[in-house]
């Protein structure tokens, strides 16, 4: 009888908890750790945690990045990561520094950074770092490591947010990522392929097999090939509205937002 009574009390407590917390949905809303994929004429990736914001971008559209920052009300960015070096990189950094508050900037290489930008970052006390020798960033719920791809001006980025692993790669990064030897566990839950139009799908398949992602977000025209591998597929540029992806069945929110629907976060 005592055992039945105890079990009944536990059941009631569980039921009340579900009613008040609203199940996984309420828990997800309370979770401060998010990974957001946004399109504002420039694909930007925002990692957020308690008091920590990391913005990752391709780095070739100043207006798109600034629009995303304004719409998402990003008043302070702890780390800005530009995944590739473009002709517009200098202009982007200057505009970014003047219109937003950033503590640290990460580039694939410091070669090509103008003296004007170097002076400006020194004046504003902003640290500027390179991926060439490898880069590590570790905070309470966000960790990130990046490495420059040899013979190119691009970088490959691996991040972990609340134990969810994310890889940010482009066409130039495929071969390097497949042969990674300096990262013990290359498996990722989310694979983000930026600005990739590779005609040969073999490299993509090898990369997917190597990293074994649960979710792929890309702009490749090979959805069918990837779907055959049993991986969920999203095309960021064609996505409509707001999507919430549940990864590993846990209560973490990963947002795919599209500018086309006129979505503005509150």
Please annotate each region the language model reported.
Residues 22-79, 128-187, 193, 199, ...:
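Core dinuclear metal-dependent hydrolase active-site scaffold
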Residues 61-108, 179-217:
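Active-site metal-binding motif and surrounding structural segment of the metallo-beta-lactamase
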Residues 29, 47-48, 97, 115-121, ...:
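Short loop/helix-cap segments at secondary-structure boundaries that form the rim of catalytic
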Residues 68, 92, 96, 113-126, ...:
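Short, aromatic/basic amphipathic alpha-helical patches
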């Amino acid at each position: 009888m005592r055992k039945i009574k105890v079990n009944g009390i536990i059941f009631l407590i569980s039921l009340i908890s579900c009613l008040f917390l609203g199940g996984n949905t309420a828990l997800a809303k309370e979770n401060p750790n998010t990974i957001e994929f946004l399109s504002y004429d420039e694909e930007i990736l925002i990692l957020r945690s308690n008091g920590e914001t990391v913005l990752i971008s391709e780095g070739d559209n100043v207006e798109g990045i600034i629009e995303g920052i304004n719409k998402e009300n990003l008043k302070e960015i702890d780390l800005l990561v530009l995944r590739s070096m473009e002709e517009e990189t200098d202009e982007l950094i200057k505009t970014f520094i003047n219109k937003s508050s950033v503590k640290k900037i990460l580039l694939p290489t410091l070669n090509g950074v103008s003296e004007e930008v170097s002076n400006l970052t020194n004046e504003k006390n902003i640290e500027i770092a390179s991926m060439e020798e490898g880069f590590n960033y570790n905070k309470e719920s966000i960790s990130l490591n990046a490495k420059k791809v040899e013979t190119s001006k691009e970088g490959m980025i691996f991040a972990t947010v609340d134990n969810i692993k994310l890889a940010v790669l482009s066409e130039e990064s495929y071969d390097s990522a497949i042969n990674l030897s300096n990262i013990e566990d290359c498996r990722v839950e989310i694979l983000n392929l930026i600005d990739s139009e590779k005609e040969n799908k073999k490299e993509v398949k090898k990369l997917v097999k190597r990293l074994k992602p649960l979710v792929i977000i890309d702009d490749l025209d090979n959805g069918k090939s990837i779907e055959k591998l049993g991986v969920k597929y999203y095309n960021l540029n064609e996505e409509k509205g707001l999507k919430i992806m549940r990864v590993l069945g846990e209560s973490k929110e990963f947002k795919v937002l599209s500018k086309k629907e006129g979505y503005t976060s509150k």
